[in-house]
């Protein structure tokens, strides 16, 4: 399964073989036009570093307004940004629809902080986005996520879940409408691939040259690393 990286260093992600890189937007409406200028400078810098065709995405983490998001998308068009993610809070359906109506070639994605299939139905019916991004561990688990994927398929909308490692992978491997997986680069300098769950699992699958290979083991294909598990109580017991 192909994987893209969420990272602070798209150049390292490309070197490690990932099929694209998503980086955080550093400035928002509170910083005004000076912040916008710095945002575009960063986009321009990363485009020059990784080359013309390498997929670049931007994560806005629900921090923008409708006018700001529209301006950002328009000013990013010369730099071939693949998508702009989560520009608004999750239930701002009317705002998302306005942005979608005004934006050109850049894809709009959202859904990480949407928690029910009824919310995802609203995103779809109001034409709020080009890609849905449910988090498997937040939206109701595997059963609910399957319903969301099926719902999205009726609108010809792909689903690229928010990164949750094996939980996302085993959903996505079953559906052709889930074209790529997200991997969160957790190493301090963003220069290494490390386990998303730390030492929790013995055999968590990790990307290799931009792909994750899953096994046919039962369940999610991983086992708890019991030697690393210790009980920590938030309050001391008498």
What is the meaning of each model-derived region?
Residues 1-57, 61-63, 70, 74-78, ...:
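N-terminal capping/lid subdomain adjacent to the active-site entrance of alpha/beta enzymes
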Residues 6, 59, 86, 161-162:
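Active-site-adjacent beta-strand anchor residues
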Residues 20-22, 85, 133, 160:
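Conserved beta-strand positions in the central sheet of alpha/beta enzyme cores
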Residues 27-36, 60-68, 85-93, 115-117, ...:
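Short, small-residue-enriched loops and turns at beta-alpha junctions
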Residues 80, 91-211, 215-218:
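Shared catalytic-loop signature of beta/alpha-barrel
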